[in-house]
Amino acid sequence: MIQKSFVMMKPDAVQRRLMGKILSRFEEKGLQIVAVKLMQIDEDLAKTHYGEHADKPFFGSLIEYITSSPSLAMVIEGEEAISTIRKLVGATNPLEADLGTIRGDFAMDTGRNIIHASDSPDSAEREINLFFNEDEICDYEIVDNKLIYE
């Protein structure tokens, strides 16, 4: 089933100039980038996005970190995109992430773990709508999809 997922490269990925390397992993897997924007996330958007963590002790430092520098917000589409992206991203704690995953290869700390990816269809829809207007998402066909999907 073709799905859309929200993915965000966090400030540490942007500051460390890892955006191109990370983007290429999604494209090499056969996923399609349908929206992307480099943005400075303000405190209100950060608190809304991470609202589920509001009562946790790390919430303040998470908001401070995510608003400290630009992030790269994306919508990525493909066959079973949500689970495929989660596998590419790796475990939340980089020390538990397998080598070969984005976090396993590039991150060292749970608080600075490079990337966020939607964990379910519901969260993908909510996060996409939070960061993108409908007219910012491109619907286009990749000519080699016939070689990737049956």
UniProtKB/Swiss-Prot annotation:
**Gene3D superfamilies per record:** Nucleoside diphosphate kinase-like domain
- Entry EC no(s): 2.7.4.6
Listed GO CC annotations:
cytoplasm
Question: Which positions bind ATP?
Answer: K10, F58, R86, T92, R103, N113
Q: What is catalyzed by this enzyme?
A: a 2'-deoxyribonucleoside 5'-diphosphate + ATP = a 2'-deoxyribonucleoside 5'-triphosphate + ADP; a ribonucleoside 5'-diphosphate + ATP = a ribonucleoside 5'-triphosphate + ADP
- Entry annotation: catalytic residues: H116 (pros-phosphohistidine intermediate)
Q: What class of enzyme is it?
A: transferase
Q: Which cofactor does it need?
A: Mg(2+)
Gene Ontology molecular function terms on file: ATP binding; metal ion binding; nucleoside diphosphate kinase activity
Q: Which PROSITE patterns match?
A: NDPK, NDPK_LIKE
Localisation: Cytoplasm
* Name of the protein described by the UniProt record: Nucleoside diphosphate kinase
Q: Which gene encodes it?
A: ndk
